[in-house]
């Protein structure tokens, strides 16, 4: 029950999460405190890039969602999760770790830059 706090109000149902946990191409890393309560997680996806046949294929570990419980912030849990993701990506022989950040989410941008990430590409939209 305590670990469900990690997924409450999130984008996955318990059933979807159960299926994700079975998928080796979508690893989930969880940080727990000394009471074994979930205080953060990183949902990832192993991707093969590029999707074109005219380039050399490589593997990417994409961070779909990295989140730390608001009351546990400032304890370096996000840094620990990110470092763990990098370590696991190396074990999987990935070329890179990637993620998306919403424009204007300055705290997240600063956090990922502090962790050594750099902007790779910029996607724009025109809403109809």
What are these regions (language model features)?
Residues 8-58, 64, 82, 127:
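Acetyl-CoA-dependent GNAT
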Residues 47-49, 71, 104-106:
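Short coil/turn motifs at secondary-structure junctions
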Residues 56-70, 100, 122-125:
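Conserved acetyl-CoA binding element of GNAT-fold acetyltransferases
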Residues 68, 74-87, 113-115:
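Conserved acetyl-CoA-binding loop-helix of GNAT-fold acetyltransferases
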Residues 94, 113-122:
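Conserved acetyl-CoA-binding loop of GNAT-fold acetyltransferases
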Residues 98-108, 125-128:
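Conserved beta-strand-loop-alpha-helix junction that forms the acyl-donor binding cleft
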């Amino acid at each position: 029950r305590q670990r469900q706090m990690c997924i409450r109000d999130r984008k996955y149902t318990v059933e979807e999460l159960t299926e994700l946990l079975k998928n080796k191409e979508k690893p989930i890393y969880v940080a727990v405190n000394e009471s074994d309560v979930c205080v953060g997680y990183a949902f990832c996806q192993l991707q093969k890039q590029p999707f074109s046949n005219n380039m050399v294929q490589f593997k990417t570990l994409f961070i779909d969602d990295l989140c730390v419980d608001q009351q546990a912030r400032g304890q370096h849990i996000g840094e620990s999760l990110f470092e763990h993701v990098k370590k696991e990506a190396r074990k999987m022989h990935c070329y890179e770790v990637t993620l998306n950040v919403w424009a204007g989410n300055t705290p997240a941008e600063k956090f990922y830059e502090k962790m050594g990430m750099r902007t790779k590409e910029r996607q724009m939209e025109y809403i109809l």
